[in-house]
Amino acid sequence: MPQKDPEPVHDALADAVLRFVPEGARLQCGPGQLGTALLRRTTVPLRIDTGLLTDAVVDMDKHGMLIDMPSATYLFGTEELYDWADGKPILRGIDYTHDLTRLASREPFVAVNTAIEIDPFGQVNVEGRGEKVVGGIGGHPDYCAAARMSHGGLSIIAVPSTVNGHSPLVDQLSRPASTPAHDVDLIVTESGHADLRGADWSQRRRLITTLFQ
């Protein structure tokens, strides 16, 4: 299945996120338009340690930005991706790809994930709105926790400031939290970021609220 090209907001969001990703880091990101933008727009070589791998990794490799062999649980893309991956030891079981101890060791691990809802303290909901289910929890909490444990790593929640005219910031999540606030280091939008590291609850509220104003 062909990947959907990023829109300008995804490119801007990717550029804002990539400021925090050091050369040689291990990057985890989702399979959507933001993930595609991240892999296409990085200007420093990176390692990929993620759950689902798409065609964007082929583009990354062609431009000399891929270090070592990527690790993933699934492939999802076109024949170009499958041909590129054929014979390579890329795919692993979830017991390997989502292992927090492994992810938190070695090179800095930077997890970049999205959110449907974020509350003023940084709790994240990725599964739906109210009774409407959008998707499963996937590896969201695993990767965020591993990035927090990683020396030099970062857990980043990256979201457009508005989606379909609505802010992802809500007073209260409409579903249970998918990822707890303490596993979120940074919230990044296309126009800025909130650095929550070391912030107490009142500071978190102020930083997050200001970001989405």
Predicted feature descriptions by range:
Residues 1-213:
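Conserved phosphate- and dinucleotide-binding cores of soluble alpha/beta proteins
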